[in-house]
């Protein structure tokens, strides 16, 4: 028998990837439901009508009266819970839920739950690779790749989920085996009232967690939990008890656990301090669920990074080009600038700009002054970044990404690196951050 009673009506709100996974989940269980979407032609509409022609679909402005007729609304993460029709439904006593809440009710295997302003996808993928290396039947997804509900299966031994703050808003209690907030920096300020509001959403991941992993360098990642809950930590300093970190010996840095050296960072394919932090976070999470060190370290050595995350593109005339298009907020750009900037002999030429989502760019000024030779700006909020940077380094404004790459190539010197790390979303000029990254790589390849 399903955990959800089937005597009342449900509505799936939003017909993107997660919405379609909800449709499949409810249909498999024979539960009555309808689908609504604020868009006239949502991305999965044709698929829904072809596979589930019996399901009622309403597109366009949300009908509050219709939503109030349901016992439960499954809201997709792309829609704010402050949407007036949703607020009215909640006030009438309609339960507001989502795909992660349903997943948590059904999952039988332990869950590794990962959120954070940055590095979620890299750490999630790493933990998944570590589990595979340990011969675990693992399912990896959530905000990354496969929607969580599509992962559910009886033979799975471990779930590894990347979760966004939007997904966590509709999850009452995840009950993860181990949960982490990797880092917290300003993001999505166009949707939240401020950092405190955003921080609260992120920390919903810890509800019911049996173990937690925290970032020693970021106090905002540490939850208010009972002393009886095991707490592991990671950071770039020397580790102590129940901690992962870096040990330096004879001029060589090692990934380490407590007082034991594990692996020289020189054996990693991923570069930069931010990636060493990602590796340590993955080790902490894997260790918490019992993955053996030999399997985890083997997976780490084989991992070459994800596309558009500080990804090496090519070297030209002694200058390396890196695609960090996934850096859609200030915190991600800071991690790339500081991590890569400290790891090269020369300076960075930074390409930045786009849709800033209401962010404050002033935190970029100091690391840009320290690590960058120049900054090339483009996109809607280029002017805001220019104001924040002031006269820290030379600034160049351009209209297109092709022009940005050409200007960066002229500014860079041998030993430098050109880094696309926009600190902004891409939707003002591109379909998504992936397209921005692909077009950057294409422009780099086309340099004379």
From Swiss-Prot:
User: Can you name one GO molecular function term for this protein?
Assistant: UDP-N-acetylmuramoylalanine-D-glutamate ligase activity
Indicate where this protein resides in the cell.
Answer: Cytoplasm
One Pfam family this chain carries? Mur_ligase_M
The protein's annotated pathway: Cell wall biogenesis; peptidoglycan biosynthesis
What keywords tag this UniProt record?
ATP-binding, Cell cycle, Cell division, Cell shape, Cell wall biogenesis/degradation, Cytoplasm, Ligase, Nucleotide-binding, Peptidoglycan synthesis
Could you tell me the EC number(s) of this protein? Answer: 6.3.2.9
What broad class of enzyme is this? ligase
GO cellular-component term (any): cytoplasm
Q: Which GO biological process entries does UniProt record here?
A: cell division; cell wall organization; peptidoglycan biosynthetic process; regulation of cell shape
What is the annotated role of this protein in its UniProt record? Involved in cell wall formation. Catalyzes the addition of D-glutamate to the peptidoglycan precursor UDP-N-acetylmuramoyl-L-alanine (UMA).
Protein name (record): UDP-N-acetylmuramoylalanine--D-glutamate ligase
Organism of this sequence: Pseudomonas aeruginosa (strain ATCC 15692 / DSM 22644 / CIP 104116 / JCM 14847 / LMG 12228 / 1C / PRS 101 / PAO1)
